Every structure is written in structure tokens, then in C-alpha cells.
UniProtKB/Swiss-Prot annotation:
Residues 17-90 bind DNA. One of its GO terms (molecular function) is 3'-5'-RNA exonuclease activity. HAMAP family: 3_5_Exoribonuc_YhaM. SMART domains: HDc. It comes from the Bacteria. Residues 163-279 form the HD domain. Belongs to the YhaM family. It is an enzyme of class 3 (hydrolase). Disulfide bonds: none annotated. This is 3'-5' exoribonuclease YhaM. GO terms for biological process: rRNA 3'-end processing. It comes from Oceanobacillus iheyensis (strain DSM 14371 / CIP 107618 / JCM 11309 / KCTC 3954 / HTE831). PANTHER family: 3'-5' EXORIBONUCLEASE YHAM.
Length: 317
């Protein structure tokens, strides 16, 4: 979707339909109300400001509403911003629907499901295999449709499964290089590590954090679920403990959200693979939006760095 909002350049005019992802009220220094809107289409999202917002604007311009907007692409603090000139809610005769504005994984759900099944069939430890299969059966529909996050990486439909399948591909190659790695543990950790996000996140459209997600987080919720599922399946043994540890430690550090650091080899590798895939997804989509010789917008999740796309890439591929 090269003509989408994410690919527009500074100074370019915009006239089209967008979906409201977030709407936040603010007040200027002289007391005038305004709205900060996060607007999106299938290509990505952009921040927009609606100055002198009315009470009616606050009540109608809410998440999951489709709007027709005209404006101009500006830059603010290193990021693109849409200056709104006119705005209205979509009407039935506009023939647009919410699903038109959702980004999606580059793989279809059927292929993602097939890749997950292949990984489970490769497992040799019956306890680990039964646990993982039970979770896939319980959450298959959500796993294949949910995003992996609200922003930064894999924040699109089927992003959660695509993140997992991409990590499995990395894990498979690393197992060839380091055959001493316990493949069952690594694959299980990859598949299970973010399933807690199904309870942490609200869904595919205008994804936000649920109350459980805000209060507990996906890591503690998933650790608890592993224990409950093991009891239900009457599975005992060290495998259950290590799987809990893999989930608990996959963010790597306490300041990144893990109560304990990785203390087994497969846990360390899971953390690194997770980091690689998340960062490559962020960078890939940011670099896709620019031309060779240009810098990306500053990426908050990448230490607020702007990345350069080399000129010689223009003549490659």
C-alpha cells in the first residue's frame, strides 16, 4: 500500500479516509481545547492535531470511527504529523469498513497455522509437546488474529502468530549451528512466550491494554496459565518449571519487564531471538517508507535513533 498514510512525504496534501486508533483531549497554554488523534490505514499510522476542538468533536471522534479528512503532512519532533484542515465521520454511502484500515501479516492465517503445527510435530518430549499443543488448541483463533503489541513491532492483524513463526524460523537455523540446544524447549518457549498477550490486549481493532493487562501483564498471566494447564493435563516434572522460567525471563532484564533474568541456555536464546525479530520488524517497516539516501523517523523503541538507508541499495534487487 505505497499510497497509504505511512508513505506520505512532508509537505504532501492528504485527502482520504482513515481509522481513529486513539483520541486524547488536551488544552493549549491559553486554555483552548484540542484533540490528539492517532489515525491509521493498512500502511501504518500518523499523529494528527485537531485544534479548537468542540465538545461534539470529543464525543464523536473516538476510537474505531472512520473519518474522511483533508490535511497536510508536517513534521514535529522528527516524526510525521497530519495537520487537519477538514474532518467528518464516514457515511454509509462512502462504502468503507474498519477492516479496510487494518494492517495484516504478510502470511495468511492458514500458512501460519501450518508452521506452528510443523514445529509441534518436531518436538520429541511428550510433556512439552502436550502442553504446547493444548495451548494452541485453546487459543488458536486468537493467536492467528491478534497483533503482538499495541505499537512498535508486529502491531497488525495476525502479528502475534507472524512474530512466533518468524522466531521459529530463526530458532531452527540456530539449532543447526548449535545442535546442543534443546530444540523442544526453545520451540516451546517461542510459541508460548507471548500467548499471554491474548489476555493482555483488547483485540485487533484499536488495540489497547485490558484491565488484566495493565494490572498484571502478559508474563505473569502466562506463567500462571502454564501451571494451570499442567495440572489439568496431569503433567509434572522439571519441564513445567523450565517452561515457566522461559516465559518469565524472555524480556531479559527487570527493567524490561522480566522478574528474573534467563538462567538456562534456551531462555537466553529465546530472549535474543525475540529481540532480533522485534527490532528487524520495526526497522524493516520504517526503512520501507523512505528512499535510499534518507533517514527514517526517530524510532522510540530503538533508543530514539533515526536509521539511514544506503544509497547503493537503490540499484540492488
Amino acid at each position: 500500500m505505497k499510497n497509504g498514510i505511512a508513505f506520505r512525504t512532508i509537505g504532501e496534501e492528504f485527502d482520504g479516509f482513515l481509522l481513529i486508533k486513539e483520541s486524547t483531549r488536551g488544552t493549549t497554554s491559553n486554555g483552548k481545547p484540542f484533540l490528539t488523534l492517532i489515525l491509521r490505514d493498512a500502511s501504518g499510522e500518523i499523529e494528527a492535531k485537531l485544534w479548537d476542538a468542540t465538545k461534539d468533536d470529543e464525543e464523536t471522534l473516538i476510537p474505531e470511527q472512520i473519518i474522511q479528512v483533508t490535511g497536510e503532512i508536517n513534521q514535529f519532533r522528527g516524526k510525521h504529523q497530519l495537520k487537519i484542515l477538514s474532518i467528518r465521520l464516514s457515511q454509509p454511502m462512502d462504502n468503507v469498513q474498519v477492516t479496510d484500515f487494518l494492517g495484516k501479516a504478510p502470511m495468511e492465517k492458514e500458512e501460519l497455522a501450518e508452521k506452528l503445527t510443523e514445529a509441534i510435530f518436531e518436538m520429541e518430549n511428550p510433556k512439552i509437546q502436550r502442553l504446547v499443543r493444548a495451548f494452541i488448541k485453546k487459543y488458536q483463533e486468537e493467536l492467528l488474529t491478534y497483533p503482538a503489541a499495541t505499537k512498535n513491532h508486529h502491531e497488525f492483524a495476525s502479528g502475534l502468530a507472524y512474530h512466533v513463526v518468524s522466531m521459529l524460523a530463526i530458532g531452527k537455523e540456530l539449532h543447526k549451528l548449535y545442535p546442543e540446544i534443546n530444540r523442544d524447549l526453545l520451540y516451546a518457549g517461542i510459541i508460548l512466550h507471548d500467548i499471554g498477550k491474548i489476555k493482555e490486549l483488547s483485540g485487533v481493532v484499536s488495540t489497547t491494554y485490558t484491565l488484566e493487562g495493565k494490572m498484571l501483564g502478559h508474563i505473569p498471566m502466562m506463567v500462571e496459565e502454564i501451571g494451570l494447564m499442567a495440572n489439568e493435563l496431569q503433567i509434572e516434572g522439571e519441564e513445567v518449571l523450565i517452561l515457566k522460567h522461559l516465559v518469565l525471563s524472555h524480556h531479559g532484564k527487570a527493567e524490561w519487564g522480566s522478574p528474573t533474568p534467563p538462567l538456562v541456555r534456551e531462555a537466553e536464546l529465546l530472549h535474543l531471538i525475540d529481540l532480533i525479530d522485534a527490532k528487524m520488524n520495526m526497522l524493516g517497516r520504517a526503512l520501507e517508507k523512505i528512499q535510499p539516501g534518507e533517514f527514517t523517523e526517530r524510532l522510540f523503541a530503538m533508543d530514539n535513533r533515526a536509521f539511514y538507508k544506503p544509497n547503493f541499495e537503490e540499484n540492488e534487487g
